């Protein structure tokens, strides 16, 4: 990949553009308590996110990154349903964009890049979140965790984007904060841009060997905007 080749940039949402853990933690805590289990803290939930809501709730009920195999499917489904309700009720008021996110998206949009969102978050929550934080209009495609049969690190969403926009893997860049994002990019054959903040279960993003590592989303402009 050379910078001049990139046409489409796919972004993860939670932990990349948006710190959503404060709201997710409130909902997870309420859901686990509602089914008679101990509650969870924001610190715990920071460690549990990144693999979709079903996994988040399984971890919260288990109080561990490893889900307790003795938890019944019925209990997990009940807790997940409650979690969705509680999360909707938060109104995403505690979530906030990371620094430089809006300015960076605006600059990329104005420069003519196609921007897409590829998140493991349930699709039904995504449009409101994007709208609320004033970034909905930058994205041509918004793909949630249930848009396809498999979530990241499966490359199905990235492959779909390449097919839709008729581009090659060398023309796409995946931007994310977790191992799943970097692996999805590798599995799709495209380059990846890993952010050091966000949610990656305490593991440095560099361990997943993205093509670029950055502390701020604004550094993405240095990678893709080649000065005239």
From Swiss-Prot:
Any one Pfam family match given in the protein's UniProt record, by short name: HAD_2
Keyword Metal-binding among UniProt keywords: yes
Top-level taxon in the UniProt lineage: Bacteria
Reaction equation(s) it catalyzes: 2-phosphoglycolate + H2O = glycolate + phosphate
Statement: the UniProt record of this protein carries the keyword Transmembrane helix: no
Keywords on record: Carbohydrate metabolism, Hydrolase, Magnesium, Metal-binding
Gene Ontology annotations of biological process type: carbohydrate metabolic process; DNA repair; glycolate biosynthetic process
InterPro entries membership: HAD-like_hydrolase_sf, HAD-like_sf, HAD-SF_hydro_IA, HAD-SF_hydro_IIIA, HAD_2, HAD_sf, PGP-like_dom2, PGPase_prok
Ligand binding (Mg(2+)): 12, 14, 177
EC number: 3.1.3.18
Catalytic residues (positions): 12 (nucleophile)
Essential cofactor(s): Mg(2+)
GO CC field: cytosol
GO MF, one example: phosphoglycolate phosphatase activity
Pathway(s) this gene product operates in, as recorded in its UniProt entry: Organic acid metabolism; glycolate biosynthesis; glycolate from 2-phosphoglycolate: step 1/1
Functional summary from the UniProt entry: Specifically catalyzes the dephosphorylation of 2-phosphoglycolate. Is involved in the dissimilation of the intracellular 2-phosphoglycolate formed during the DNA repair of 3'-phosphoglycolate ends, a major class of DNA lesions induced by oxidative stress.
HAMAP family registered for this protein in UniProt: GPH_hydrolase_bact
Similarity comment: family membership: Belongs to the HAD-like hydrolase superfamily. CbbY/CbbZ/Gph/YieH family.
Identification of the protein by name: Phosphoglycolate phosphatase
Source species: Vibrio vulnificus (strain YJ016)
């Amino acid at each position: 990949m050379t910078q001049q080749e990139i046409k489409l940039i796919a972004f993860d949402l939670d932990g990349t553009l948006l710190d959503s853990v404060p709201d997710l933690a409130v909902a997870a805590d309420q859901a686990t308590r509602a089914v008679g289990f101990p509650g969870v803290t924001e610190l715990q939930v920071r460690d549990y996110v990144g693999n979709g809501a079903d996994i988040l709730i399984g971890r919260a009920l288990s109080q561990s990154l490893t889900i307790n195999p003795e938890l019944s499917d019925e209990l997990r489904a009940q807790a997940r349903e409650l979690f969705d309700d509680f999360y909707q009720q938060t109104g995403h008021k505690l979530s906030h964009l990371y620094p430089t996110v809006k300015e960076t998206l605006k600059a990329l949009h104005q420069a003519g890049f196609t921007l897409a969102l590829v998140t493991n978050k349930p699709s039904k929550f995504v449009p409101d979140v994007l709208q609320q934080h004033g970034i909905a209009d930058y994205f041509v495609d918004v793909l949630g965790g249930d848009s396809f049969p498999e979530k990241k690190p499966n490359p199905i969403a990235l492959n779909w984007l390449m097919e839709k926009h008729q581009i090659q893997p060398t023309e796409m860049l995946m931007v994310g904060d977790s191992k799943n994002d970097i692996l999805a990019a590798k599995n799709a054959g495209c380059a990846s841009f890993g952010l050091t903040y966000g949610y990656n279960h305490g593991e440095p993003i560099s361990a997943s060997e993205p093509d670029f590592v950055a502390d701020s989303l604004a550094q993405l402009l240095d990678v893709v905007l080649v000065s005239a």
